[in-house]
Amino acid sequence: MTLCLVSALVFGAFSSVSFGVAASGLPRHKYSSGKQQEQSVALPRTSYDIALALDFDKRTFTGSEQLHWFNKDDQATSVLYFHLYANVRGDDNSNNNNPREVSSNSGSSGGSEIQATPVPDEPRTDVTEVRDAATNAPLAFFLDDRATTLRVNLREPVAAGTGIDVLINFTGSVPEIGPDETGLLAHVLGQVDAALRRTRELRRARDINFRSRGVMLLGSAYPVLAARTGGDWRRKVEPSIGDMLYTDVADYHVRIEAPNDMAIFTSAAERRSENSGHSEQAASSKALDTKAVNSSASTSSIAHEFTGEDLRNFAFVAGRNLRSMERAVGKVQVRAVYMAEHETVARRALAAAADAVRVFTARFGEMPYKTISVVDAPLVAGLGCAEFAGFGVIASAFYVDFDAPAMRNLPELIREQRASVEDSLEWTVAHTVAHQWWGEVVGNDPERAPVLDEALANWSALAYYQEAHGETRAAAALDDQLRGVYRIYRTFGGEDLTAVRAAREYRNFFQYAAIVTSKGALMFAALRRQMGDEKFFAALRDYYAENRFEIAELNDLRDAFFAKTAPAEKRQLARTFSRWLAEKHGDEDIAPPDPRLAESLGVNTNTAKSGDQQQQRNKFARLGKFFWQQMTRIR
C-alpha cells in the first residue's frame, strides 16, 4: 500500500493548504516483476488467494488466505514473516522487539494461535491457524513486536528457485469512529493544534481500518507478507508520522462475502458476484476455510470475487449508502465512489481524477491498472487521503456542496471560502491519483525515503494544475499548497529541516507536510526549471519505466535525472538535489516566517517556552474555534 498520509484544510484566514502522506544508499531491490525480468526470464509471482466473510453490523470479519511465495534469492529460507498492520498502535512504546511464543492451539493439531490484545477503539487481526498448503500440516507461528509481526517457521527450508504455499486463517474487527472525529471542524482544528504543538504524533491503524457514518474501510485487514530487501525480510513495522505499509507487488484473487444490501469497492476488478448461502459456493476460493468463513456469513449474503495483478496491497470499502460513477480515460476506467448525499461534489472529484489520469499518462507513462477509484470516506482528522493500489480514499470533510440549500443561511464570511475548499479538494484528488504512479506502480520504502512518493505526488498535483488550468491558477496553487505550507510552518515556530530524514524523525503531520511533501515537491519544480521540460519529463518517464512494480531508491531517481543531463551540467544537478534534500535553505528558497501573519494571530515566531507556547495556543484557538465552528454548519 501507498498512503497519502496527511491532507489538511487550513485556509481562509491565513492560507489554503493541502498536506500530503529517507536516505540515500539503500540496498538495491530489483527482483519483483518489472522491466528487469522482462529482459531475462519471468519468475513465478507472489500471489494471495483470500476469502473474507464480513459482518458489517458487528464490525467483524473472518478470513483465510493462501499465499504462494517464490524464493528469488540465492539462499534458502526457513522462516516467513508477515505484518499484521491492523495491530500497530500509535504510541512509541506500543511496538517493541520482545518476541512472544504463544501457546499451542489444541484444536489445530499442534498449530499455534496468536491473538492481539484487544484495545478499545482500535482495529485488530488475530491469526488462528497456519498450515502448509501442500501437506495440510500445521506450522508453528509466533508473535513479535506486540502482534504486528507474524513469524512462521517452515518444516523444510524453501530452496532458492523454489516456492511454497501457506494457508493462514484469521479473524478481525474494526472500531466505530464517531462523526466528531471526521468532520470539517475536526480536520481544521486538528491542523491548527498540530501547528502549535511540540509533542510527537504517529499514524494509527484505525486511520485506515474503521467503520464510520455507515462506511467501512479495511485498508490492511489480512496478514501481509513482509517485503524483502538485500536477501532478508523487512521484519519490523516502524510506526511513524508517515506511511507504515511497505510491501512488494503480488497478484490477488479475493472473495468477499457480505450482506446482499452492501456495496463493495476494492483495489481489484470485480469478476463476478453471486448469492452465497452455501459452503459449496464459498469453496471456489482455494484459500478458504469454509467452516471458519461461513460461520460469519448469513444466508442472505452475496459473494463478490475480485482479481488484480501486480498490486502492492488490497483494500476495500463497504457500505449500504455507497454509489459510484465512472469515466473512461484511454485504457483506464476512472471511478468515483461516494456517499449518496455527496453526489454533486463527487462529480467534480471524478472530473478532476479523469483529467489527472490524462495528464499523468501523457507525462509519466501508461497506467497498468484497469481501474482507478477515488473514494469518499470519513477519514479521521489529520488524514486527508490514503492511497492503495488502484484505489485512493479522500476525506469526506472535503465534500462540501456550497450550492446546497443549507449554505444559503450561512454568513458571507463562510461562503466566501468556497474557492479555498474546492481547490483543496481538487488538489487532493490530483495528489491521490498521482500516488498510483509514485508509490503504487513505482514502490519505495515510505519510512526511509518518503520523499520518493509524497514529494513527487505533491509536485505532480502542481503539474496537473499547470496543464488543466494554466499558469495563473498553477502559480496560485504553488503559493498556497506548497510555499504556503512551509511559510505557515515556519511562522508558527517550526524549524527548517532536511528532507532526507526517515519518516519517524518528523515530529507531527504539520512538520512532515512542510518538509517532505512541500519542500520536497518544490525540489522537482527547481529541477524542471533547471533542466527544461524535455529532459525533465524524459527523466521521469525513464524512472517510471525502469522501476515499475519494484522498490525504487533515491539513487534510482538521481540516476534517471543524471542520465538526461550533459556532463558539464551534472555538478549543478547534484547541487540542486543536495540543496533541497540534504541542506536547509527553506527560508531562502521558499519563504521565511511571516511576521505580519504572526502578529495578527498573536503568535511568537521564536521557539516558545512552555508557558508562552500555551498562551500562543490559546490566542489562536480563540480565533480558530470561532471561525471554524461556523464551518461545521456546512456538514
Go through the PLM ranges and name each one:
Residues T2-S16:
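Bacterial N-terminal signal peptides
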Residues S16-T62:
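N-terminal, polar/Ser/Thr-rich
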Residues A53, D57, F306, E546-R635:
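Beta/coil-rich, acidic/histidine-enriched accessory regions frequently appended to metallopeptidases
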Residues T62-V88, N93, G107:
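Ligand-binding face of N-terminal immunoglobulin V-set domains in extracellular IgSF glycoproteins
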Residues G107-E129, F142, V166-V317:
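Extended, low-hydrophobicity, Ser/Thr/Pro/Gly-biased non-transmembrane segments
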Residues V254, E305, L322-Q436, E440-A449, ...:
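Juxtacatalytic substrate-recognition/specificity segment
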Residues H342, E366-P368, E447, T472-R473, ...:
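Amphipathic alpha-helical substructures
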Residues D423, E454-Q530, W580-E588, P593-T605:
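Acidic/His/Gly-enriched intrinsically disordered linker/tail segments
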